[in-house]
């Protein structure tokens, strides 16, 4: 297959690209060139902001992708900026479980939806959870995975609503609460009861492929 990967140099996207290469697929990664691993697997690179992808429409046509993976769409405009350039081929999109109403309850400390969640659980009625609140570093105020899903829905894209994921190259350092204590020489780490299922990036990447 010839797979076009939008954003694919960090965390989950990086592992997806590596898995595609290991499988023998031809891969073209569209990214800004700010987080390109070195050394890395020998795949094609197109250095551009996704909002300027239309300037490289000929390169996309020449590559002639037979599948697309969108690994880093954070806003609706992130998607609409590429729809006119990316061909209508099978597409996989990384989304998040924060699209569910239960995420609002998590942020506000109120029970707003039944848990555990299932795929068809109620979606959030409110939008843009980080607007005016100062979200995580690098996350825009108009971040909204619901907008991402809606923008891709016209293409029949497969949307994967990922849970919290850990593993190598995680910029949010989700394991730091444990690693910090290990580095400090702690032999015991008192913690509360386990109430969260985590998924490892390596296996998430394999699932996408």
Regions found by a protein language model. Give the residues of each.
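N-terminal Rossmann NAD(P)H-binding glycine-rich loop of SDR-like oxidoreductase domains
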Residues: 3-23
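Conserved glycine-rich Rossmann-like NAD(P)H-binding loop of the short-chain dehydrogenase/reductase
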Residues: 26-32
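NAD(P)H-binding glycine-rich loop region in Rossmannoid oxidoreductase-like domains
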Residues: 34-93, 99-105
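Conserved Rossmann-fold NAD(P)-dependent oxidoreductase catalytic core, especially the SDR/UDP-sugar
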Residues: 80-146, 158
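Glycine/proline-rich active-site loop of Rossmann-fold NAD(P)-dependent oxidoreductases
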Residues: 167-177
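A conserved pocket-lining segment of Rossmann-fold NAD(P)-dependent short-chain dehydrogenase/reductase
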Residues: 181-201
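Conserved small/polar residues in nucleotide/adenosyl-binding loops
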Residues: 204-209
